[in-house]
Curated annotation (Swiss-Prot):
Sorted UniProt keywords: Developmental protein, DNA-binding, Homeobox, Nucleus
Organism this protein belongs to: Homo sapiens
Protein name, entry field: Homeobox even-skipped homolog protein 1
Record Gene3D superfamilies: Homeodomain-like
Residues within the DNA-binding region(s): 183-242
Length: 407
């Protein structure tokens, strides 16, 4: 009590530096502990952070008894606010606080850099919720590890454990991210047998029922959903091909009827349009005339009656056979003029050889208008592939007819 009263009296008198040094030295000699640390290190535990300790103190490492005594530091210009704090900390008690402060200062110095590195460690950032959760857990574990490091005297030994646990959480979050990124649906690789069976079924009926889908799924070892999607895509493909075929034809009713007559002659082909069969295009020669004039000049104007046209259009999905224009020798002469037919081979199109066997009325006059001879051909239209038209755009019409069909 006496010493505390004297300290208060001398604090009021202003003779602070020398008395603080004497009292502290007397207390340290009485207790038997080494000299206390400078006032910069005697900071409360709650304030211990990487930025609370000055850089000069960090460079010196853990302080020992060889450092400067408190007398010189207390006499320096530390300010009147820090001196009462030092005196009060020295007068608290001579027992256990001194070893705890020493152990904290001895092990807190190297651990301050660890804490700083923990605070500023980079963390992976991702947009998926799983990764965000993993990063949140990672940060939480990091924060708890740093708190344990500051609060406990043996925080340095607990640092690897906390780092290991947090690293495990981060790796789990990264694995979850990669697993979510790899969950993609790839295209089904159909075999030739599966494609042939599906095409055969589509040729039979365009819309397949669910029991039939189940049978196909069991027979082909495919999921029912895959078969359903395949039929949807196949119907859309067939629709696009039919629209591409019939797009330019309504401008010329006679030519449209002629083309649809070939579509009505479909029968044995598994695919509605073979890949080697190009789409028909108008010739630039016949585009200048009006549709009525071209219909009147066309030899196919009386080839089919309106009833036959409606009969052709009544079929839901026509499968056209090989076009007559690609079988005629005048357009593509030679044995390799296109689709394997010889130069003098017969033509089996409806416009040339449709008779009572095909369900059409006999028409001798119309048949005489158009035969397979090279003398009867029409200049009002020609069917060419786009590649042929692009290559022979500046060639005369007679030379253009001799261009072989490109597969």
């Amino acid at each position: 009590m006496e010493s505390r009263k004297d300290m208060v009296v001398f604090l009021d008198g202003g003779q602070l530096g020398t008395l603080v040094g004497k009292r502290v030295s007397n207390l340290s000699e009485a207790v038997g502990s080494p000299l206390p640390e400078p006032p910069e290190k005697m900071v409360p535990r709650g304030c211990l952070s990487p930025r609370a300790v000055p850089p000069a103190t960090r460079e010196r490492g853990g302080g020992g008894p060889e450092e400067e005594p408190v007398d010189g530091l207390a006499g320096s210009a530390a300010g009147p606010g820090a001196e009462p704090q030092v005196a009060g900390a020295a007068m608290l008690g001579p027992g256990p606080p001194a070893p705890s402060v020493d152990s904290l200062s001895g092990q807190g110095q190297p651990s301050s850099s660890d804490t700083e590195s923990d605070f500023y460690e980079e963390i992976e950032v991702s947009c998926t919720p799983d990764c965000a959760t993993g990063n949140a857990e990672y940060q939480h574990s990091k924060g708890s590890g740093s708190e344990a490091l500051v609060g406990s005297p043996n925080g340095g030994s607990e640092t690897p454990k906390s780092n290991g646990g947090s690293g495990g959480g981060g790796s789990q979050g990264t694995l979850a991210c990669s697993a979510s990124d790899q969950m993609r649906r790839y295209r089904t690789a159909f075999t030739r047998e599966q494609i042939a069976r599906l095409e055969k079924e589509f040729y039979r009926e365009n819309y397949v029922s669910r029991p039939r889908r189940c049978e196909l799924a069991a027979a082909l070892n495919l999921p029912e959903t895959t078969i359903k999607v395949w039929f949807q895509n196949r119907r859309m493909k067939d629709k696009r091909q039919r629209l591409a075929m019939t797009w330019p034809h309504p401008a010329d009713p006679a030519f449209y009827t002629y083309m649809m007559s070939h579509a009505a002659a479909a029968g044995g082909l598994p695919y509605p349009f073979p890949s080697h069969l190009p789409l028909p295009y108008y010739s630039p020669v016949g585009l200048g005339a009006a549709s009525a004039a071209s219909a009147a000049a066309s030899p196919f104007s009386g080839s089919l009656r309106p009833l036959d046209t409606f009969r052709v259009l009544s079929q839901p999905y026509p499968r056209p056979e090989l076009l007559c224009a690609f079988r005629h020798p005048p357009l593509y002469p030679g044995p390799a003029h296109g689709l394997g037919a010889s130069a003098g081979g017969p033509c089996s199109c409806l416009a040339c050889h449709s008779g009572p066997a095909n369900g059409l009325a006999p028409r001798a006059a119309a048949a005489s208008d158009f035969t397979c001879a090279s003398t009867s051909r029409s200049d009002s239209f020609l069917t060419f592939a786009p590649s042929v038209l692009s290559k022979a755009s500046s060639v005369a019409l007679d030379q253009r007819e001799e261009v072989p069909l490109t597969r």
